[in-house]
């Protein structure tokens, strides 16, 4: 059965007691790790409802992260397009330059609460690695980050930042040497070190309770955005909310503020890469089928024999052959569209030169679609886009490989 949006409190309904979002999710992990995951789920649920834990989280949000991040109108771009008015939620202004710190701070607090001394994770574009290293340094924890060798070359500045912050960086050379392989490597490291380390997974993927934990700590984005948008629009909500989608941390963060509002259309933008040919994109929801990846039942890109397919995108953070279980459940409640590399680069340049905001290539996927959507909407409509990260990491790559 597919999920349908209804009026009510969404968070209290999903996932179920077994960690399922509809038919997706669950726990497909080795038996020896299941007690650890059960303890993590219990700890998160208890901590989430503890005033002292929430106070520490609130203080970190304000004094360390610099939250709330603003919502503002893209007046210049909206005037150029001439349709709906565009607004952005500026997660690029979150400390470290992306939304990733939202759940990294949460994982660090959980690790300390559980008596763990180390955080382990994977990273693609490097933003999650930087955020995790930052949170680990702030909370006095060790940090180990796994990154594919291909991504390491594209994100050297972020890799240097991780090392400056004290993280151990592990380069992964297997397979495509990208995000999936980094995730495999990080999981293997966690399986060896779980007694003293916590796997601070990079997105809303993996076995229960990881998707829930990431969504809960990212929900601050949607909560803030809802209040901020209404404050500058006379109490009105946006007609459309747009976010790029891979694992789902960014999308679930902004959706969390609007899932109970049936009048708000939600959009998820996938990477079409170079083309719709197999191996040249990472548009999982567009072309994928049900399967299992990294401990969770979800939609994946795979061949007829069930082998995980090769994937491609200009945005390293979106080069993943699966999608989180909660996003899978929302397949019929959210409108999913794929945007290719060329459209993404065009949006990257246009937002930079029209508004003075350089977006991450991941975020530029959402911007590209939002511009298309605005052009066909009535001028009375309003579109809110999550700018999940800044594009410092991408500037050299884009300038060297794509003429403006």
Per-region residue spans from a language model:
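Short glycine/serine/threonine-rich phosphate/pyrophosphate-binding segments
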Residues: 97, 101-107, 121-139, 153-156, ...
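Active-site-proximal loop->helix
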Residues: 120, 128-186, 277-288, 394-403
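A short, small-residue-rich loop immediately preceding and capping a beta-strand
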Residues: 95, 103, 111-148, 236-250, ...
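Positively charged, low-complexity intrinsically disordered leader regions
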Residues: 2-25, 32, 38-116, 345
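Claisen-condensing/thiolase-fold acyl-transfer catalytic domains that form or cleave C-C bonds
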Residues: 245-249, 341-402
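Active-site/ligand-binding loops adjacent to catalytic centers
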Residues: 183-209, 213, 263, 268-357, ...
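Buried hydrophobic positions in well-ordered alpha/beta secondary-structure cores of metabolic enzymes
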Residues: 26, 70, 88, 100, ...
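Glycine-rich ThDP/TPP pyrophosphate-binding loop and its adjacent helix/strand module
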Residues: 180-189, 196, 205-263
């Amino acid at each position: 059965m597919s999920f349908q949006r209804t009026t009510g409190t969404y968070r209290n309904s999903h996932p179920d007691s077994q960690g399922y979002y509809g038919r997706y999710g669950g726990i497909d992990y080795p038996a020896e790790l299941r007690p650890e995951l059960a303890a993590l789920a219990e700890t998160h649920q208890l901590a989430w409802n503890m005033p002292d834990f929430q106070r520490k989280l609130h203080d970190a949000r304000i004094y360390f992260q610099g939250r709330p991040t603003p919502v503002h109108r893209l007046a210049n771009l909206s005037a150029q397009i001439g349709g709906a008015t565009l607004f952005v939620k500026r997660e690029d202004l979150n400390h470290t330059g992306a939304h990733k710190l939202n759940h990294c701070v949460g994982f660090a607090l959980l690790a300390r609460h559980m008596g763990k001394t180390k955080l382990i994770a994977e990273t693609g574009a490097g933003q999650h690695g930087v955020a995790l290293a930052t949170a680990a340094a702030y909370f006095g924890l060790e940090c180990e980050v796994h990154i594919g060798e291909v991504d390491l070359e594209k994100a050297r500045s972020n890799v240097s930042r991780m090392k400056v912050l004290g993280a151990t960086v592990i380069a992964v050379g297997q397979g495509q040497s990208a995000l999936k392989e980094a995730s495999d490597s990080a999981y293997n490291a966690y399986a060896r070190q779980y007694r003293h380390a916590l796997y601070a997974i990079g997105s809303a993927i993996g076995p229960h309770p990881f998707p829930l934990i990431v969504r809960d700590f990212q929900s601050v984005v949607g909560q803030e955005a809802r209040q901020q948008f209404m404050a500058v629009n006379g109490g009105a909500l946006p007609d459309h909310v747009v976010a790029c989608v891979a694992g789902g941390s960014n999308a679930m963060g902004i959706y969390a503020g609007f899932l109970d509002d049936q009048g708000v259309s939600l959009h998820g933008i996938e990477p079409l890469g170079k083309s719709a040919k197999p191996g040249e994109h990472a548009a999982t929801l567009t072309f994928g089928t049900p399967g299992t990846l990294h401990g969770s039942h979800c939609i994946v890109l795979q061949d007829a024999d069930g082998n995980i397919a090769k994937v491609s995108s200009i945005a390293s953070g979106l080069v993943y052959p699966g999608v989180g279980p909660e996003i899978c459940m929302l397949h019929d409640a959210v409108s999913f569209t794929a945007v290719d590399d060329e459209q993404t680069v065009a949006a990257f340049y246009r937002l930079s030169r029209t508004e003075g905001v350089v977006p991450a290539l991941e975020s530029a996927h959402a911007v590209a679609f939002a511009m298309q959507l605005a052009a066909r909407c009535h001028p009375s409509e309003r579109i809110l886009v999550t700018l999940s990260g800044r594009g410092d990491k991408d500037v050299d790559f884009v300038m060297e490989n794509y003429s403006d």
